[in-house]
Amino acid sequence: MWKHYLKCDGSPDPSIAQEMNTFISLWEEETNETFEQVIEKSKLVLSLIKKLKLILLETPSCDLGDKMVAQHQGSILRLQELLSQKVDVATELLLREASTLADLDSGNMEKIIQDENVTLYVWANLKKNPRYRSVKFSGTQIGFEIPKILATSDVALRLLHTRYDHVTPLFPTAVPGEERAPIVEEEFRKEKSTEKAVSTEKALSTEKAVSTEKAVSTEKAVSTEKEATSQDEEAELKQDREGSLVPEKEIISEALEYNEVPRISYQEDENAEATKYELEMRLLSEAVSAAQLHLVKNIVELPDILENEVDLFHFSTLGGVYHLDILALPPQYKPVKGWVLVEIRQEGLQRFPYPPENTDEPDPESAFPPIEVTLEVDENVIFFEDPQVIRWDAEGKLWRTDGISCVVYDREERLITFNLDTLGPVTLIQDTHINMPYQSWELRPLGVNRVLITVTTLFTELQIHIKENLCMLASIKLRSQEHLSHLEGKWMRPVPFIMALKEAGVNIFPTVYSHFYVVVNNKVPMVEVKAYRQMALLSSAFAFRWSKWNMSCNSSRVVFRVKEGLAEEAEEHLWALLMFSGDRAQLLKIREDSEVFSEALKEETEFHSTLYHMVKDFASPEAMEKVRHSDCQFIDSVCHMLLSIRVLSFS
């Protein structure tokens, strides 16, 4: 979070729990904030939530730990709940002065407050005219068709369009502890035991040195005492000395060994440091492998889905959430002799129940018909097919498809109209896998540490430019005039870039559940991971492309085309067919336009253990020089993008 410290803007560091708790507590104490003030504060709140989500997504689970993951998710939930509470309080303050903001023509109050993240539409029914049943907000086609009972009641209609989704429950982003690679935990135990053994050996050496010092000093004292004795005891002393020669030699030998102790300990320290470094590197490698394998693994079983429940593994919510509410109109301000009086109710903003839970009407459906709603679809979201409308079930904490009827979508005007049995949060969904499987793909170098990934689907062709550790949407081709101007040309790190594309409706990133909804060319996870690693390593100088023969080989092998990227010619004969099994790479004798698949080795070529060693057989010195000068962050970014798109399994 070095960038955070450089800003010095007084905002809390989302990675520090104490700062987040202080920020939330101080904001809770602020009261009577207007809607404009809440919207302004929400910019910081949404930024903190986004940073917390990025921490959870970008940081390896072994570095965060379950406690830290729970802490960050708790901070996200608290911020979301507090922001919702602040919006309700600000809405109540606005509705209290509805009479002073009333329109001169209709006599009712209408208010629109807009921001890049939030748009508020509020209509207060002050006149209660039974013939005034069509509510359209000025300058828009957004509005409601309300029944007579609402047209004659003290109610207000609120449409709060948030371009973020704080309704859908957070899904865990960390890998559960039991799914981590066992070898990682084993190596941690080995490292601890090695450090313990080294420290024990040092302690024994120190203890041995101390005992040697004591023995030498004792011998010197004895010799001095013997020289001071009388001459008549000389023979006896001589005999005593002869009898003590062996222990003396042992003591001297121990003293000499003691002099060598520092040298031996220094060597042991060096060996221990080298062993520790090797262990750390191995642990890091295993942790990275576990994280990469997690990106390409497939869940064995789908969770149970209730009737009319939206399967969020199959569909994605897009365009934010439309919070539709019928509110009880609060007491209005009353000017009295220069004073303004208002009744303050402690229960706060109240929802108006529609239809009521208990009714004596013989035909409730005719007395309380559905409410017609017209909404505008977010212009920064692409729907490749007509969107579906779903509603939030607050009691069950899930999205549902029932209670919605007569859906009409106007693609040209980007308007969607539907009937809703009861108002509440609604959103639009699209099939998550609408652009899967891919029709083709290509990874092409643009220079050292620069590549272009092209993915062609049924509905679109998009190009992703990767430079060093940053990604950018270079172009996107669509059937209509829609385009993602807010994303094109904007450089982002891989994880935020993937999030931005998903939120825009352009999803080419499979999940662990995607194989249930897409016909995939499933490959062995480790083979797929190793292939992406090798492709990323060579991507500065070599181009890779989709091959139809990848469907013909078994799951333990992948087939794709390769050529040196320095060659400017576009002839098809420059592309070679390559087959890789994770531990063996070979060029195939067949070509892309051959009629029958064969694993026969190409003439005058050899088997190799990696793609790197294989391409060295035909690559130019300039190409291999580019590979050697590739930046590690660039290689990691390309590898992460390939692992996220999974071109070998979903093409």
Locations of regions flagged by a protein language model:
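Noncatalytic interaction/regulatory regions of large eukaryotic proteins
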Residues: 1-383, 404-409, 414-415, 419-651
